[in-house]
Amino acid sequence: MTAASEKTTRRFTIDCTKPASDSLISPSDLGAFLQQKIKCYTGKKEKLLHINANGNIVEVDVTGGFIGKQGLKWQIGRFLHMKKLRAFIKIFAQGLDGFELRYINVEEGKEE
């Protein structure tokens, strides 16, 4: 890594408003899962990764770029799979640094 990439900080936002309003998932549970599962350099996780759950939005601050948007999306997918919600909730991109969790309309996929 270069010195410039170590100092850059990216903030990812995960909007859990729709599933959290129905009490399917808790944003604090998602934040705790991400804190536990995201791998980092030994002993440096506290400095490089900060996760805050404010209301229905989870904010992930990453310093150094050790996890990107695709890796974070994969971890969110693992969380939904663990909660057995992967078949009902899909992860959509929301801008360059954000995600939104929405319900999948199962009826659209059926042919008549």
Curated annotation (Swiss-Prot):
Gene Ontology BP annotations: cytoplasmic translation
Keyword terms, alphabetized: Cytoplasm, Ribonucleoprotein, Ribosomal protein
Cellular-component GO terms for this entry: cytoplasm; ribonucleoprotein complex; ribosome
Record's subcellular location: Cytoplasm
GO molecular function terms attached to this record: RNA binding; structural constituent of ribosome
InterPro entries with a match to the protein in the record: Ribosomal_eL22 (IPR002671), Ribosomal_eL22_sf (IPR038526)
Entry annotated with the keyword Transferase: no
Subunit structure: Component of the large ribosomal subunit.
Family to which this protein belongs: Belongs to the eukaryotic ribosomal protein eL22 family.
Protein name: Large ribosomal subunit protein eL22
Provenance organism: Encephalitozoon cuniculi (strain GB-M1)
Gene from which the chain derives: RPL22
